């Protein structure tokens, strides 16, 4: 029994200095300014290589979608419906990618509910689309139309466009638009 106590005491005597010496204030961690510079570099890389290109692709695809939808309005053909559906899928893809980092203007100006509100207010959208006076005002004045501000989130954006050009996941028949 004495041998066990002696061995235990000896091990503790050897371990204690090791434990005490390993607890140093100098752990070679970078200082605040080094960490700040590293964080800034990481953020800049993410913004420049992910955020900006994704938002640019979203903007470009959305402009293409708007153009194709304008073509569809002027020349309602099945080919133009199909083109609009293809452009909608492309633009929607970039929106979905961008939701990972709603950053900058997307968060500052609360863009999400304007273009991605759910659920779609289907019955109200049907009423709106059948209101000839409102549609005429929107045609004439565009986004600056007084009636535009009364639409509300559930009648705007991707889901509203989807409702107009798709049915059951397929391009809608042009005769139904």
How would you label these PLM feature ranges?
Residues 30-177:
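Mature extracytoplasmic or organellar-lumen-exposed domains after removal of signal/transit peptides
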Residues 19-22:
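C-terminal motif of bacterial Sec signal peptides marking the signal peptidase cleavage site
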Residues 24-27:
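Bacterial signal peptide processing site
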């Amino acid at each position: 029994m004495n041998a066990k106590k002696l061995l235990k005491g000896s091990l503790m005597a050897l371990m204690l200095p090791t434990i005490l010496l390993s607890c140093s204030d100098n752990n070679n961690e970078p200082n605040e300014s080094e960490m700040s510079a590293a964080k800034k570099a990481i953020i800049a890389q993410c913004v420049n290589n992910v955020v900006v290109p994704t938002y640019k692709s979203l903007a470009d695809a959305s402009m293409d979608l708007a153009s194709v939808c304008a073509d569809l309005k002027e020349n309602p053909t099945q080919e133009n419906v199909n083109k609009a559906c293809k452009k909608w899928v492309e633009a929607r893809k970039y929106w979905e990618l961008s939701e990972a980092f709603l950053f900058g203007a997307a968060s500052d100006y609360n863009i999400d509910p304007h273009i991605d509100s759910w659920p779609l207010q289907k019955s109200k959208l049907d009423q709106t689309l059948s209101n000839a006076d409102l549609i005429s005002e929107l045609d004439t004045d565009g986004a600056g139309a007084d009636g535009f501000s009364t639409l509300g989130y559930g009648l705007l954006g991707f889901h509203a466009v989807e409702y107009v050009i798709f049915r059951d996941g397929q391009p809608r028949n042009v005769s139904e638009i």
